């Protein structure tokens, strides 16, 4: 899918951005309520768990490291079309206090 600001993202890239609380649409990321972000984060975790057979919860850093180092999945995760923009945004989300707040909420009230 092509997403403004990212380019042509792979399903894994999209799942990771959504795990970080991004609401994606072909027009680009949109401002969203906490409820919308929490919902998309839950859906992304389910999709990642289903595709990988692993579950790192809502820990974006753990998922990121796993996907970077998995021989089978890293190629899709780092696929060149959108990787530069996706990686930049994942790095920002890893340090984003608002995303960490949402992650804490999900961990406290699954």
Go through the PLM ranges and name each one.
Residues 1-110:
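Extended repeat-based scaffolds of very large eukaryotic assembly and lipid-transport proteins
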